Amino acid sequence: MYAVFQSGGKQHRVAEGHTVRLEKLEVATGETVEFDQVLLVADGETVHVGAPLVEGGKVVAEVVSHGRDEKVTIVKFRRRKHHDKKMGHRQWFTEVKITAINA
């Protein structure tokens, strides 16, 4: 059984037991989170596709950890002007483990 749900403006395909990195959620480590924006649920032969959401669909997950991704380097450069600017960005994430998928 797997599901596609939406969180943080992105869609994630998950099954029970999977660990997924999502955009940062303001939830403490060890707590459970419910995602109700379920777009698709597939269980063996049957596939429930929402229009746009599956009615009664829910993905339950447990927050494993919070952290930051690897640094992305940004370089701005102006030719012939002896001007360059180097910056970096590290995005916060929340790692969750999927515990249940309900259709």
Curated annotation (Swiss-Prot):
The record, for Pfam families, names: Ribosomal_L21p
Q: Which GO terms describe its molecular function?
A: rRNA binding; structural constituent of ribosome
- Keyword Protease tagged: no
Could you mention a single GO BP entry for this protein?
translation
UniProt keywords (A-Z) are: Ribonucleoprotein, Ribosomal protein, RNA-binding, rRNA-binding
Which SUPFAM superfamilies does the record associate with it? L21p-like
Q: Which GO terms describe its cellular component?
A: cytoplasm; ribonucleoprotein complex; ribosome
- Superkingdom classification of source: Bacteria
User: By its UniProt entry, which PROSITE patterns does this protein fall under?
Assistant: RIBOSOMAL_L21
**The protein's role, per its UniProt record:** This protein binds to 23S rRNA in the presence of protein L20.
Q: Which NCBIfam families match?
A: L21
Q: What HAMAP family does the record tag this protein with?
A: Ribosomal_bL21
Q: How is this protein organized at the quaternary level? A: Part of the 50S ribosomal subunit. Contacts protein L20.
Family (UniProt):
Belongs to the bacterial ribosomal protein bL21 family.
What this protein is called in its record is Large ribosomal subunit protein bL21
Question: What species was this sequence derived from?
Answer: Shewanella woodyi (strain ATCC 51908 / MS32)
